[in-house]
Design a protein with these regions (language model features):
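Bacterial N-terminal signal peptides that target proteins for export
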Residues: 1-10
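Bacterial N-terminal signal peptides
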Residues: 9-18
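Sec/Tat signal peptide C-region and signal peptidase I cleavage site
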Residues: 19-23
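Short, well-ordered surface patches within globular domains
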Residues: 24-87, 127-128, 132
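A well-ordered secondary-structure block
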Residues: 82-154
Length: 155
C-alpha cells in the first residue's frame, strides 16, 4: 500500500510542476509560429516576451472559427459581441486590449503583413500589452488567424 501511494505521488508530481506556459506548447504549427514571431520582434526591441493567456486563446479560437466559417476577415462579425464582450465571455480580465486578424496561406505571410501595417505592428510592440492568445483556423481562403493581446486588469 505504501509503495502504491508513493507511485501515485510520483506520477502526479510532474503535473504540478508543469509551467503555466504549458498551454502555449499545445499550439498548432501556425499558432506557435505567430507566437514565436511576435516574441522575436519584441526581443529585438528589448521588450519583454508576451505570456500565453488561455482565456484570450479561447476568445481568439471562437472568432477565428467564425471568420473561417463565414469566409470573412472582420473584427466583429454579425451577431457576435465586440472584442471587449468576447473577452469578458471568455473570462479574461483586462485594462487594455488589442486584436490582429488576417487571412493568408501561411504564418510567415501573415506576420510580415502585420509588421508592415503600422497599427498591427504597434499592437505587437506595445510594451503595455503583456499577454496574448492566438488561434489560426484553416478556411477556404487560407489560414484565418486571430491574435488578441491584453494588459492585465489592475483590479
Amino acid at each position: 500500500m505504501r509503495n502504491s501511494r508513493f507511485l501515485l505521488a510520483a506520477t502526479l508530481l510532474p503535473i504540478f510542476l508543469i509551467p503555466s506556459s504549458f498551454a502555449a506548447q499545445r499550439l498548432s504549427e501556425n499558432e506557435r509560429a505567430l507566437f514565436d514571431a511576435a516574441n522575436r520582434e519584441r526581443g529585438a526591441k528589448s521588450l519583454p516576451a508576451l505570456q500565453w493567456d488561455e482565456a484570450l486563446a479561447v476568445a481568439a479560437r471562437k472568432h477565428a472559427n467564425r471568420m473561417a466559417f463565414y469566409n470573412l476577415v472582420e473584427h466583429q462579425l454579425s451577431g457576435e459581441p465586440d472584442l471587449e464582450g468576447r473577452l469578458t465571455l471568455a473570462g479574461a480580465r483586462f485594462s487594455i486590449i488589442a486584436e490582429n486578424i488576417a487571412v493568408a496561406s501561411n504564418s510567415e505571410t501573415i506576420h510580415a503583413g502585420w509588421m508592415d501595417s503600422p497599427g498591427h505592428r504597434r499592437n505587437i510592440l506595445n510594451p503595455n500589452l503583456t499577454a496574448v492568445g492566438i488561434a489560426a483556423v484553416r478556411g477556404a481562403a487560407g489560414s484565418s488567424p486571430c491574435r488578441i493581446f491584453r494588459c492585465p486588469s489592475r483590479s
